[in-house]
């Protein structure tokens, strides 16, 4: 994959996330007039992007040692403060919860009164019950406002993968797709977005009960770094295990090579949990790929809701690629069709 003498491994930018230049999107990415698009804070938008797109963001709640908070895109607390606290206290964890039907009802009713056909691209149902709460609220709004169009779509993608879906949904709305068509488009398009991530430690997985504490302890001593991806439902799964951080980062780049669509008109996302140095390294490697020199790469920080489950040091790459459904077994493909027909 990489020549041992490749100097690229040494050419790592030290620029902090806060000092990165804001992402400049083309004029195609602006607030559409024909469709209102709503998303939630678990899409982990880069600073200023949601505002440029005109996307409304519903904030997820979480509870820390000092009480309840809302994921406001790191305005109330910096990502560094949040994750540094987890580094210093390995037992520190936050309680996360779904968005309630009542909160959704308030947001959707406000949209109904304004009248613009609305699409809500909701955080994957594989990781949160919020999707079902949103559907319940949408049904209540449809009953009260029968002429109002509202569609709830399970985005099937955690974190910044959803940001890519939102970006292109806005683009397609500006190209003339209706709200109904955007919902149908998003439900299909989400299957072409890939996401791969690696963790700095296994502590967060152990604290969340996903692996035994003993396994995390042994894994730490062996310098084991898991690489995760998400399946067709949006649930995180372990793809492989690497020995050492550098091998894990190289594995992310190899996955990019294997699955990237090579459509350079579509942006790539890199997201981290207070691990910008490694995020910068990933960008440098992507730009070395043929045709990717001028690619739009959007850097984001994972929010507190997902961040609590992956821990500090997580770094991920998300991009448009091949149809992920092609990798499903025949049985799983049939199961997906059954789910959609019900």
What are these regions (language model features)?
Residues 2, 36-100:
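N-terminal glycine-rich anion-binding loop in soluble enzyme alpha/beta folds
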Residues 1-10:
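N-terminal acidic, proline/glycine-rich, low-complexity intrinsically disordered segments
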Residues 35, 116-120, 266-268:
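Generic beta-sheet signal
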Residues 88-127, 132-136, 183:
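Glycine-rich phosphate- or other oxyanion-binding loops that anchor nucleotides, phosphorylated ligands
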Residues 14-32, 42-50, 56, 61-63, ...:
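Mixed-charge interfacial surface used for oligomerization/domain docking
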Residues 87-89, 115-120, 142-153, 299:
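Glycine/charged-rich beta-loop-alpha catalytic/anionic-binding loops adjacent to active sites
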Residues 39, 122-124, 153-154, 318-320:
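Short beta-strand segments
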């Amino acid at each position: 994959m990489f020549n041992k003498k490749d100097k690229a491994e040494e050419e790592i930018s030290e620029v902090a996330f806060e000092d990165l230049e804001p992402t400049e999107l083309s004029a195609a990415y602006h607030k559409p007039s024909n469709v209102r698009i709503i998303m939630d804070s678990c899409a982990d938008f880069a600073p200023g992007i949601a505002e440029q797109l005109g996307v409304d963001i519903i904030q997820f709640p979480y509870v820390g040692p000092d009480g309840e908070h809302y994921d406001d895109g790191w305005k109330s607390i910096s990502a560094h403060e949040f994750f540094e606290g987890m580094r210093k206290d390995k037992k520190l964890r936050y309680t996360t919860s779904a968005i309630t039907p009542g909160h959704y009802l308030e947001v959707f009713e406000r949209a109904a009164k304004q009248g613009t056909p609305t699409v809500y691209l909701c955080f994957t149902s594989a990781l949160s019950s919020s999707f079902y709460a949103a559907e319940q609220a949408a049904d209540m709004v449809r009953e009260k406002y029968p002429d109002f169009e509202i569609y709830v779509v399970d985005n099937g993608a955690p974190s910044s993968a959803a940001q890519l879906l939102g970006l292109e949904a806005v683009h397609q709305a500006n190209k003339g797709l209706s709200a109904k068509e955007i919902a149908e488009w998003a439900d299909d398009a989400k299957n072409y977005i890939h996401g791969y991530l690696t963790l700095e430690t296994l502590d967060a997985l152990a604290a969340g009960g996903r692996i035994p504490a003993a396994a995390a302890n042994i894994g730490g001593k062996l310098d084991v770094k898991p690489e995760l991806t998400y399946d067709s439902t949006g649930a995180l799964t372990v793809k492989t295990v690497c020995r050492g951080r550098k091998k894990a980062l190289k594995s992310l780049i190899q996955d990019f090579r294997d699955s990237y669509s090579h459509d350079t008109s579509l942006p790539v996302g890199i997201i981290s949990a207070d691990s910008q140095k490694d995020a910068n390294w990933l960008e440098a490697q992507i730009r070395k790929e043929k045709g990717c020199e001028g690619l739009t790469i959007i850097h984001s920080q994972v929010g507190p809701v997902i961040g609590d489950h992956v821990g500090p040091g997580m770094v991920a790459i998300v991009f448009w690629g091949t149809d992920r459904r092609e990798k499903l077994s025949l049985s799983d493909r049939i199961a997906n069709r059954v789910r959609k027909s019900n």
